[in-house]
């Protein structure tokens, strides 16, 4: 459906909003804005601070491949941070922060842990981390191969 003017869709938009069922849940304004060529970049050993703000709905951020070394769920750096969280909680209408030191190279996925929103609606960001693999942290015991059976 198309509209001639920017306000012409108001009745249809309000009808969708009344259902409280989002059609998009995105990071940085649009689906895919922080994946592929637009992925965030980091290097092994770098500490990265993630700020997560949520307007209307609660969110459960999670870094697949890592975790929150330091997490300020309510966003106040004056408060003592929680440590080593897999997933944390950001209340609707608030913001929080998480710091993580990348220890291995690879592609990490920062998601809303409601994975339906992450995968189908766009709440995913990627961090491409460059550097040398550290076998002291994790060793590959068998090379990747096709699954048989």
Model segments located where?
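Copper-binding active sites and cupredoxin-like electron-transfer domains
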Residues: 1-149
């Amino acid at each position: 459906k198309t509209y001639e003017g920017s306000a012409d869709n108001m009745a249809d938009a309000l009808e969708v909003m009344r259902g409280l069922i989002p059609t998009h849940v995105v990071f940085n304004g649009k689906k895919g804005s922080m994946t592929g060529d637009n992925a965030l970049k980091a290097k092994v050993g770098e500490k990265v601070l993630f700020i997560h703000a949520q307007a209307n709905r609660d969110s459960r951020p999670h870094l697949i491949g890592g975790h929150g070394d330091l997490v300020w769920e309510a966003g106040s750096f004056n408060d003592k941070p929680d440590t080593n969280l897999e997933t944390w909680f950001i209340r609707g209408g608030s913001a929080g922060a998480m710091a993580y030191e990348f220890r291995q190279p690879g592609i990490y996925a920062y998601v809303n842990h409601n994975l339906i929103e992450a995968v189908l609606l766009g709440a995913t960001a990627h961090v491409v981390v460059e550097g040398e693999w550290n076998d002291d942290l994790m060793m590959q015991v068998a090379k990747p191969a096709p699954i048989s059976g």
